[in-house]
Amino acid sequence: MGAGSVWASGLLLLWLLLLVAGDQDTQDTTATEKGLRMLKSGSGPVRAALAELVALPCFFTLQPRLSSLRDIPRIKWTKVQTASGQRQDLPILVAKDNVVRVAKGWQGRVSLPAYPRHRANATLLLGPLRASDSGLYRCQVVKGIEDEQDLVTLEVTGVVFHYRAARDRYALTFAEAQEACRLSSATIAAPRHLQAAFEDGFDNCDAGWLSDRTVRYPITQSRPGCYGDRSSLPGVRSYGRRDPQELYDVYCFARELGGEVFYVGPARRLTLAGARAQCQRQGAALASVGQLHLAWHEGLDQCDPGWLADGSVRYPIQTPRRRCGGPAPGVRTVYRFANRTGFPAPGARFDAYCFRAHHHTAQHGDSEIPSSGDEGEIVSAEGPPGRELKPSLGEQEVIAPDFQEPLMSSGEGEPPDLTWTQAPEETLGSTPGGPTLASWPSSEKWLFTGAPSSMGVSSPSDMGVDMEATTPLGTQVAPTPTMRRGRFKGLNGRHFQQQGPEDQLPEVAEPSAQPPTLGATANHMRPSAATEASESDQSHSPWAILTNEVDEPGAGSLGSRSLPESLMWSPSLISPSVPSTESTPSPKPGAAEAPSVKSAIPHLPRLPSEPPAPSPGPSEALSAVSLQASSADGSPDFPIVAMLRAPKLWLLPRSTLVPNMTPVPLSPASPLPSWVPEEQAVRPVSLGAEDLETPFQTTIAAPVEASHRSPDADSIEIEGTSSMRATKHPISGPWASLDSSNVTMNPVPSDAGILGTESGVLDLPGSPTSGGQATVEKVLATWLPLPGQGLDPGSQSTPMEAHGVAVSMEPTVALEGGATEGPMEATREVVPSTADATWESESRSAISSTHIAVTMARAQGMPTLTSTSSEGHPEPKGQMVAQESLEPLNTLPSHPWSSLVVPMDEVASVSSGEPTGLWDIPSTLIPVSLGLDESVLNVVAESPSVEGFWEEVASGQEDPTDPCENNPCLHGGTCHTNGTVYGCSCDQGYAGENCEIDIDDCLCSPCENGGTCIDEVNGFICLCLPSYGGSLCEKDTEGCDRGWHKFQGHCYRYFAHRRAWEDAERDCRRRAGHLTSVHSPEEHKFINSFGHENSWIGLNDRTVERDFQWTDNTGLQYENWREKQPDNFFAGGEDCVVMVAHESGRWNDVPCNYNLPYVCKKGTVLCGPPPAVENASLVGVRKIKYNVHATVRYQCDEGFSQHRVATIRCRNNGKWDRPQIMCIKPRRSHRMRRHHHHPHRHHKPRKEHRKHKRHPAEDWEKDEGDFC
């Protein structure tokens, strides 16, 4: 390559480099053309605690240019708020030319610390922070035509709350106050925290400790009893530093939540211990008071009281609404006593608020302790096989929902709820397949809900019956669909939106025969379930087993109370001590062998007069009647649903005792004689069993035909004890038959009491045909007296002395897609008691999307029962606690032993006026809430899609229970009831479902006509405006002149003729008034209602620009300007204010020479004629009435000189000022007159001279009472 080529190549390369450099310079010039550049921060929101200082960053850069040296950047900070769906910027400060102007409301709280030394640093320093400071802030920098901005988000954390000890108000020393805050996940608040909360509107008239050992409280609205050291001014009151041993409340400060607070609202409410257990099952703990306040601060809103870790019951309200504790947002507290002290009793039932930390940390005040609550573990098929249930010691109860109004269930069916009583556990074998419960605590109560199963034998889980296992059972659990807890919409507008945890429904495949255990009290039914059956070949159609067994006493305790000795069972039926026995039925061909079961019956306390009785053998133990149904066509297993009611006790009428009985030989196993009635006609009862064993004499319930009815005998239902042991066999036809040849009756004393129970519901699908019903209409019941307590002649027996009764449920059976071809029944045995008890009931069903028509009819002849319902919230959350007592209606004298035949008639049903409503039952059988009398429950299921209804029909003379009987409304509230639902009308100053919340009486503005309300301890007082009186300022004592309209103590008149502003004001003054002033939104609305044109008002800034004043010299308390007004738009000035009619009367400043209508305003209190003054007269025309603030002037008569002030004013009370003017003749004229008459020397007596020296009495002295 030649030298020329190299040179040319070098020139080409140089040219390319210059070209690139030129392009780069062009790009740099373009980049630097913009002289202002914002350095935006992208670090996320700025977080700071309450009452602290925070710096909101804002940085920008300036590129110096000769053309813009004179352009100085303007910095503006605003807060972005959303109002009416649109963003609005509230100005904070503006900085330019080394001058910083701070907007009103931010003065003393904001600054630019780096300005003006560092003009490019516009960081805003804000503090002490308030909770309302949270939000979005805009930093805007303007230089010439360039505009840059940045947004910064501020989050203020922490909340101040007042804490009161559980025992009383003002009960904490300084050390105890610090500890109370620590247990509430907070610290004791500092004075700056309380001041910041006050500036945000915190108002609480309770003195509390602060961190500097001072005692203070914040008051935004002064009222009697809350003045403190600031009189009637708002502010934080202070008692100064106090002795640490003095007692006050405390103000706590919670800084960070560090987790989530969630509401737990199960279908039935929880005790305090149950709430702890419920939270622990969800991997959380009960929330503390501070955590709930922080959650409320972050937006939690739930109108449902719930337990907290300190034992208090509170709930957070963001949006105030009716029946949620008052008109202001906040965390409400439920107090135990009317004086707003005390936490609810731990046994009371509420919902719960749980806290789950983001990182597992120990929570203050809620340590991990074994639960002793009322909630049992729920068996779930999702868990590992062989899961053991380990309940804590002590009996646990489940309270059924208090169905006092229709329930709206959302979600699917609810999982079973388990309760247990601790007893020795035994591990039993189980049939392979599916999860297995390795051990089950004895006396455990669970609710089974039936579901289709592929197993050969249906378990008690196919029946919606409350059952209680008396011994550990080895059970096979078949997997069932996961169910969710339903949520209810009840009183108080409460709607639960969350769903409970998914739990599994257990199904017990092979219940074994166990000795029964006592399990029922008055209105507290916990029947024992004990069955003995051998399973048929699983290839056959499934069997449905329904067993309701006679109860047997346990260790003499029901719940936490012991039974009286007079209610113990006879040793002739049950031994006080039964050793562990082993019962294994003989298997049938093709049947699976039932597992062996070992059981032990605890000792029963003996009566002092009772002789020792031998322990009976295994054959003497009470067994059960097994109700079996077969399906010959191999149809799948349909659910069996049943509901039971609590037992009720009454006396038989005297005429129902028939002593015509024939004794029969004793059975070797029976220690007592028995009889068989001669006139009893026993028909076969369809019970699916062919051979029955009678280990001792029993009584079997059977239909009885009655040929007469005594006038005293009402229609009642009683039943007999069943002591049969049945074994299953495949049989032909849907129903088996029971041979009554072995049926005998136990002896019954003539004054025996009869214990009845509400009839149950039994739904037994399983037949291929449709339609038809079967009802066991008449049953018998007997019981035996205790030995040693024979009935002496003449003695009386009351229902309280009944020792044992066999109670039957009378089902009306409807088959789902099948016909009922025989009646069925099963018996239970219960013990009456007057002890406080809780009615436990849960009902479940696996019916899918069916509508069930249920008709309930009450039998006659029931005694009056008194029910005292405990206090509580009426929402159907799962509890109904009642204390029942029975009035002894009549007693029967002692007679020899006799059997019992009861005449029966058809139950006469009459409508009770109960509401009838449409019920849609997606998958849950709704528990029935009836009265205290006997009821027969008929269930008719026509098809899976037929709509049904609830209708309650009553017969007899008993009145339904009145929920307002004991007036659950507190503080003088009035209870109103509608059936079983009640509501409270609260007196002034109280709110809440039961009027338990004491609110400010003045919140609802009780004072009328503009009166000022002042809240007091037990009421309020009204300070009335002039011309009003009465306790509520409801009395109008002064009126207005004709053509004027009165409003809140003033008179107003609208003048439609147009005048300039000055002329309008002059005309109003001629009428003893002024152009109207406006001091409240109510007054503005009243004035704006006069006309539909723009009108003058008395506001003006004619004296000082931008200093607006009213012409009546009242203060500027209220403003209602149009947007961007006042603006003083015209160069000549806009000094007068007009109400713009088409913009709802908003104000605008305009020139005063406009001709517009106007409104005059004057007072209602007027003064009479001015007082007369001697030697003086009024200037102008004398009037009959003068307006308040009107002035008059006196002038002296001719020849008299004026001394002192000549004007007086009409005061607000309608009286004139006392005149000060004095009119006196000059002394010179007297001397001249004396000198002129001197030659005559007409001397007068000295006495007359003294008389003339006295000044004459003036007229105004006579009217002394008219002056101030």
UniProtKB/Swiss-Prot annotation:
| Gene3D superfamilies tied to this protein | Complement Module, domain 1, Immunoglobulins, Laminin, Mannose-Binding Protein A, subunit A
Link domain ranges (all copies): 159-254, 258-356
Compositionally biased residues, Polar residues: 419-430
Q: What is its main location?
A: secreted
Q: How is it modified after translation?
A: O-glycosylated; contains chondroitin sulfate.
Disulphide bridges, residue numbers: C58-C139, C181-C252, C205-C226, C279-C354, C303-C324, C964-C975, C969-C984, C986-C995, C1002-C1013, C1007-C1022, C1024-C1033, C1040-C1051, C1068-C1160, C1136-C1152, C1167-C1210, C1196-C1223
| Any one biological process term the GO annotation gives | regulation of synapse structural plasticity
From the UniProt entry, list the residue stretches annotated as the region Disordered: 363-391, 406-442, 472-540, 574-630, 1228-1268
Gene Ontology CC: one annotated term: extracellular region
Q: Where is the signal peptide?
A: 1-22
Q: What does this protein do?
A: May modulate neuronal adhesion and neurite growth during development by binding to neural cell adhesion molecules (NG-CAM and N-CAM). Chondroitin sulfate proteoglycan; binds to hyaluronic acid.
- Mind telling me what this protein is named? Neurocan core protein
Q: Which gene encodes it?
A: Ncan
